[in-house]
Amino acid sequence: MTKGFASSGLVVVILAGNLAVIAAADETHIHRNGFAGREPFWIRGDANIRFEEKRHKISDEHARNAPTSELVAIEAHPPGGATEAEFVHYYYPIPPAPVSPRLHAGVWVKAYRAGVELRARLVLPKERDPQNPEAPLTTLLIGDKYRNVRYWEPLSLGNVPELLRRHLPVLHARLGRAVDPSDAYIDQIILNVYAGPGLTEVWIDDLEVGPVLPGSVPRPSASVATPVKNGSGSDDRPPPATKSVRFVEGQIQIDGEKFFMLGIRHSDTPLKTLRDANLNTVWFPADASPDTIEDAARQGFWIVPTLPVLEVPDNRGPRESTVSLAAATLAQQLRKYAATDAVLMWNLGGGKTAEDFPAVKRTVEVLNEVRFKQPRAIDIWDGFRSYGSYIDAIGTHRWPLFTSLELHRYKDWLSQRKSLTPANTMTWTWVQTHLPEWYINQVIGQPGAVKFDEPIGPHPEQIRVLTYLSLAAGNRGIGYWSDRFLANSHQGRDRLLELALLNTEIEMLKPLLLSANDPAKWLGTSHPNVHAAVIRSENELLVLPVWLGPGTQYTPASAAIANLRITVPLVPDAAIPWLVTPAGVTELKGWRRVAGGTEITLPEFDLAAAIVFTSDLKLDGKIVRWQDHTRYRVGELAAQWARQQAIEQYNKALLTHQKIIAAGGPELPETGSLLARARESIDRSREFFENRQWDMAYREARRAQRPIRVLMRADWEKAIQPLDFPSASPYAVSFYALPKHWEFAREVASSQPEESVLDYGQFELSREAPTEGAAISSLPGWSTRQSILRQDPVIAQAGIVNSQGLADAEPQPRIQLTGRYAPLHVMAPSPDQVDKPRPVLGSHCLKLEIRPRVACNPRGQPTGRPQALERSFLAVDSPRVELPPGTLVRISFWAKVPQPIEASADGVVVYDSVGGEPLSARIDQTRGWQIFHMYRRIPAAGDISLTFALTGIGTAYFDDVRIEPLRQAVNPRLSSSGDRGAPQLPAESSTRLRYPRTVPSSSGP
């Protein structure tokens, strides 16, 4: 058996650090704080020396996990002859934590001098305080002392019952009698921050105490209690100020500082886990509870509440009373957020179109009336100009993963949406982290599933590529769609780790992303599948090379390239290239000036990278700050996260590969060596980590995932070899669905097609079509539809046209020279010329065309062709075909797209009613006539139909469309191999299943 790595089965567990939510019985009674709020939580307590509080705030200078920690900085002035009894206490109130063997109390501390000590206040409720008989007796328990200077170190109380047992004789001696310790509990965690004369700075993070009794969670110190008077006099800190949120020139500004949104839609993942993943914004549904909202604000999140959109009265009569009621409901909804200053913007919904604009406009007007001035945001599909006049932030999104939309086309789509957005409007996009409903229903076959027992996608690598493309498109915010698919219930540990790593990188790159002057420019590189986005800011450049190879949306390739070369134009003088990762920042050596710019060589490219050209090399400059940041703050975590992710990826890939083999997939001879290479890199990563070499540990963990991707990609490529395109089989769109694909393929391969049951799929008319084409309705059951916004200057037309002149040119015979001019070597004809099937066209075929409408500017001059269309959709629908549920069918059609489709990332789309648009055949251009096949199973509804659609400027032709039922003709011979006990195809067909294919008939269609 191939060796695997053990992994925990907790709910959302990241063993690499405090990205953990423990699924224990008393999980709800563990009190945690990551100190990610806006005001300090620790309260200044008593002291026996004079000191001054220099700083006390939530700080982003150092943090063990989340972006912030709490900083306490004091300057102590002890008297002469001081002993070790001096103290300056800061305390943190907690719900009562009863003393028991299970009680644990600890906190992480970092300082530049040793001596900070953890303590706790113990309450003995059965005893009275002699100096205050109305209060219970309290005493201090002493825990660990900080020693590991400049590094984060956990301080713990240790065995609390043992501490109490040892302390009882002291209390007995002090009181002169025995003490009853029953029902004792801890109610305060205390830090003695005195570490000697002078300045002491202490950063505090990741407090955890439990089990505790259910109770209220402490508020920040400014609102919890008035600090105790001490040696420094009264507390004169001003009350916390309300933060100002403004959107200026497409940027979010908070108190005048630029802010990059890293958000997520919240469902049920603990907010602490999301904060530890370095997210800073949470999108809440309309029914979010006030307690959850308050908890998010306390965790330091910015909040984006979802508000209902008001109805608009129709033309049939006054409905002002209905609108007034809706406005009152909206006002009531807004009051839920009146007590917090953490609202970043109001969300007015998603997937809106131009037709929804009047209702959104009315809602904005009501928001103005009730004087809620926070910016407004909306996610739209089209109607950019209208929404841009009323909305401060516009989001766009689509789900490219597991569909036929290649990621280089998704890149184009992002750029087109950005170009349609009005200038000075903040933009963001949602990144797909989940499986869409269609995938869960069709591929997995578990509608409404709340848990998945086997590995599922998306791959972390896919999320990384989508995020980099979103950054390159110029978005000032990233939203991750689903927090639920980050949980262990959804096999999401590796995705959660990827989000944490990505957000750590983005936090480092944020100054360059927010100061970009112009949209990114895309460059080619030395590898055709790698494109590099160049983002320019003042005196600096950010270069983002990204792997965009075919099929990445299905299953990522290895995407590892040695010595990738990029020529970057217009690099500022004295700027040096640096490779930036969350575990280290290193200079790229060997760059040189060449014609066209500066050529850099990336020794080890892996899927995506961030390269910064800068001359800011001062001691307090950007590079030094980044190096300190990775060395002392995030590098250790990044290395841990990357190694844990590699282990998770290894185990998921191994399990799925074994299931593929059991389902009849081919053995891969290189499997053993690939898995061995992955294990070796994981082991080396652990060794580097133990030696505190964070950068090397991170790199090895990343290297470990490359052979895993090679294995997954090889399995996927074997599966799709017989297909015209991957989504022709609904189970070939993901590596994790391949076991089902091989079962499906066996059934298809053992079938024979019957006659087509689709009427008029040859598009033949009883008479010759007119020059402009005959109407689609000339064929019974066939229909056409279109949806074109008036903003799109195009004209769409579909019809049945004469096929004369549309046949492919016959290949010209080669002239064979003889004699002295005869070539020494004769080039064999290409497989396309020899094996390419050719259609036998009838008299007519289907034509779809969208062409630009002649338009003029105000000066009467013709405008150019549109570069992006908001919504231009021309479609022809076939008749509905009824078949018994469960019937396998083969769909085939011939298509000819003479020129690339312009102004649309989708091009020509052909899909069936079973697989839908995600599983469509997308065509941008063909070399002559080309045949396409799709294989589907009839659903319970018992019918299927086809749609031929054009989404951009261009022309497409179709002919010989068939829907052929497949009947079982041959039962594959079953044999067992080894000890697997799984049915296998005969050896000659085990590596490539022979799908039944359409063969053109010499007698014509």
Protein language model regions, located:
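Extracellular carbohydrate-recognition regions
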Residues: A24-K54, G215-S234, W716-S830, R967-P1005
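Extra-cytoplasmic beta-strand recognition segments
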Residues: N33-A36, H89-L122, S156-L157, D206-E208, ...
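Short carbohydrate-recognition loop motifs
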Residues: K57-E86, D792, G799-D808, P813-Q816, ...
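Secreted extracellular polysaccharide-interacting domains
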Residues: I74-H104, R128-D144, F744-A745, H825-P829, ...
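Glycan-processing catalytic domains of CAZymes
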Residues: V109, G196-L199, D206, P211-P545, ...
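Extracellular carbohydrate recognition and processing domains
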Residues: Q131-D183, S913-D943, I953, Y957
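Extracellular carbohydrate recognition
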Residues: V179-Y185, Y194-P211, V217-R219, A949-Q968
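C-terminal beta-sandwich/jelly-roll accessory domains of carbohydrate-active enzymes
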Residues: H527, E538-D683, E687, E700, ...
